[in-house]
Amino acid sequence: MPRRYYITTFGCQMNKADSERMAGILEAMGLELAAEPDEADVLLYNTCTIRDNAEQKLYSYLGRQAKRKHQDPNLTLIVAGCVAQQEGEQLLRRVPEVDLVMGPQYANRLGELLEQVWNGSQVVATEPLQIVEDITKPRRDSTVTAWVNVIYGCNERCTYCVVPGVRGQEQSRRPEAIRAEIEELAAQGYKEVTLLGQNIDAYGRDLPGITPEGRRQHTFTDLLYYIHDVAGIERIRFATSHPRYFTERLIRACAELPKVCKHFHIPFQSGDNEILKAMARGYTRERYLHIIETIRRYMPDAAISADAIVGFPGETEEQFQRTLDLVAAVGFDQLNTAAYSPRPNTPAATWENQVPEAIKEDRLQRLNHLVAKIAGDRSQRYLGREEVVLVEGVNPKDAQQVYGRTDGNRLTYLPGDIETLRGQLVRVRITEARAFSLSGVPLAASSLVC
């Protein structure tokens, strides 16, 4: 009977994409996917260290599986991703039953590392590594939409964030390799790609070449133009954008290119300039608002989402109010919110002016209340409208319904048969509008692109 594997993924879209690649490697080695973790011979945890609670959850899982390994020595335990990169050998001292600790840059080398483990070694792979172009096809979770990494790592030095230390410096993939991957996805029947990067609009800064006009030869804007005409791909999304690199040229391209969905995820983190400076974000409140104004000048109905942190060290009530004011001024369609969580080896974690937990929790609740109200109000504009929805799957709560997303990334439910509608762009009249999702009725199958 072949070995079976199970992957538990924490955190961001980058981790989800890495997990798909590692699943592809495991299946190429002859392993099969297990239905449950306790049925697996190889357990892989792809980890996130942005928040402390995800890290604590990991160690809880590892403690349980370490006990299982004492009963079954053939069980292979792997910790991959950002916690693995951050902890390295220390993780083995804490949980000696772990067989392999590997940073995110080693996702494409899982096979050779696993062979070392099966030959009797306990392996730690966290040294800096140049990116390796995908050599094994990922086992993708969807047959309709796909992640495509375009840039790895991060050169920013935000004072609260561990990402540069665990994912390394920016490394952009060559445009030709990116297009080739997208062409292969189109040939397999995929309809939508999401281009991924920690700061995706910083793409190309590390690639050589200057144009006759004196600008960099490779920019994210140029990449969008380069891949846009791949036949069969109907929609192009991207995440995550950094305000520092979000230019008007990029905004114009998004407005001009019909396949590029009019949804933009641009974290702002705080609405106060002093806090932004302490965070080392590299932009001001005014700069952020100018970006949003420019997007809406070119694309009035564009959907905007973002990330925000409350309770950053030193944040006063007045500074928090500026965050609330910015949220109200922008009118976000969705906002990922979090209370500041001190992370190891970051400057902000050592500062003495930490905000008490009770105040952070109060501010988070107040912000979430405002976000839900604004999202609910903005959602009403969809009522009665026709939207084109790319159907992805079955509503897990109602087998008579399918779900998909609009151009603006609104989750939308509609009646229908998944075997008929999966991967189809369906014109839908919206009949219900909730804060973060819609419901509607199909009018006709559509071959329109977004």
UniProtKB/Swiss-Prot annotation:
Keywords: 4Fe-4S, Cytoplasm, Iron, Iron-sulfur, Metal-binding, S-adenosyl-L-methionine, Transferase, tRNA processing. Binds 2 [4Fe-4S] clusters. One cluster is coordinated with 3 cysteines and an exchangeable S-adenosyl-L-methionine. Its cofactor is [4Fe-4S] cluster. One of its GO terms (biological process) is tRNA methylthiolation. SMART domains: Elp3. PROSITE patterns: MTTASE_N (PS51449), MTTASE_RADICAL (PS01278), RADICAL_SAM (PS51918), TRAM (PS50926). Residues 140-377 form the Radical SAM core domain. InterPro entries: Elp3/MiaA/NifB-like_rSAM, Methylthiotransferase, Methylthiotransferase_CS, Methylthiotransferase_N, Methylthiotransferase_N_sf, MiaB_methiolase, rSAM, rSAM_horseshoe. GO terms for cellular component: cytoplasm. GO terms for molecular function: 4 iron, 4 sulfur cluster binding; metal ion binding; methylthiotransferase activity. Residues 3-119 form the MTTase N-terminal domain. It comes from the Bacteria. It catalyses: N(6)-dimethylallyladenosine(37) in tRNA + (sulfur carrier)-SH + AH2 + 2 S-adenosyl-L-methionine = 2-methylsulfanyl-N(6)-dimethylallyladenosine(37) in tRNA + (sulfur carrier)-H + 5'-deoxyadenosine + L-methionine + A + S-adenosyl-L-homocysteine + 2 H(+). It is an enzyme of class 2 (transferase). It is found in: Cytoplasm. Transmembrane segments: none annotated. Residues 380-444 form the TRAM domain. Its EC number is 2.8.4.3. [4Fe-4S] cluster 1 binds at residues 12, 48, 82. NCBIfam families: miaB-methiolase, MiaB/RimO family radical SAM methylthiotransferase. Belongs to the methylthiotransferase family. MiaB subfamily. Catalyzes the methylthiolation of N6-(dimethylallyl)adenosine (i(6)A), leading to the formation of 2-methylthio-N6-(dimethylallyl)adenosine (ms(2)i(6)A) at position 37 in tRNAs that read codons beginning with uridine. Monomer. This is tRNA-2-methylthio-N(6)-dimethylallyladenosine synthase.
